A protein has these predicted regions:
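Acidic/His metal-coordination segments adjacent to aromatic residues that form catalytic metal sites
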Residues: 102-115
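Preference for long, well-ordered alpha-helical segments
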Residues: 138-141, 148-174, 179-182
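Mobile cap/lid helix-loop segments that border enzyme active or cofactor-binding sites
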Residues: 1-59, 63
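Short acidic alpha-helix initiation/capping motifs at coil-to-helix transition points
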Residues: 41-46, 76-80, 119, 128-136
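Acidic/histidine-rich alpha-helical segments that form the ligand environment
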Residues: 112-155
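Iron-sulfur (Fe-S) cluster-binding segments and ferredoxin-like electron-carrier domains
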Residues: 39-43, 81-100
Length: 182
């Protein structure tokens, strides 16, 4: 359980969202039930999650999963590491690459990471640092490798995971077992 209990009564329209989340994830997510205390926050969180891009053109699912995992590790969120790391082998993410995401190994030392993946990981890490410090040069380094659309998708993906990491940790939501062996 988290730091607080979910409400006993959840509006019917939020129960539909909880059902959809359970169908998509295979888990009855505590965070969704806790958000029922603030229905507008639950609705906006669900919309954000539903509308975020999970792969588009050259920003494939592997690259975006690397970004999600990087933010999860950088924010030290056990739930997020569990959820965003689940199925990493299906995307070809190796143990060496996970060491990069965990900050154990420099990205340049892992040949399997492409230059774009290295840049995206670095950008995600910078988006998770506190305090945030961005200069035009931080985005200028991305421009030769990513389109404007792709830069926005990278930024919104990292921001989305940052949102969830802070919310989940603030409410004490434990890992949900996404990475547990079947």
């Amino acid at each position: 359980m988290g730091f607080i209990e979910p409400p006993r009564r959840i509006p019917w329209w939020l129960r539909i969202g909880l059902w959809a989340a359970k169908r998509a994830t295979g888990r009855d997510l505590l965070i969704g039930r806790l958000l029922a205390w603030a229905p507008k926050a639950a609705l906006s969180s669900g919309l954000m999650e539903a509308l975020v891009e999970h792969g588009h053109g050259a920003l494939d699912a592997r690259l975006l999963q690397l970004v999600r995992m990087q933010v999860s590790y950088a924010a030290a969120c056990p739930f997020c590491v569990d959820m965003n790391g689940a199925g990493h082998a299906n995307q070809g993410i190796t143990d060496d690459e996970i060491e990069v995401l965990r900050g154990i190994r420099p990205a340049e030392a892992v040949a399997s990471l492409t230059p774009r993946e290295r840049l995206a990981i670095g950008y995600a890490r910078k988006l998770t640092d506190t305090p945030l410090r961005f200069a035009p040069a931080d985005v200028d380094v991305l421009k030769p490798h990513f389109t404007e659309h792709e830069i926005v998708v990278l930024a919104t993906t990292a921001a989305q995971v940052n949102y969830w990491t802070r919310l989940i940790q603030a409410l004490g939501v434990p890992p949900a077992g996404f990475s547990d062996p079947a």
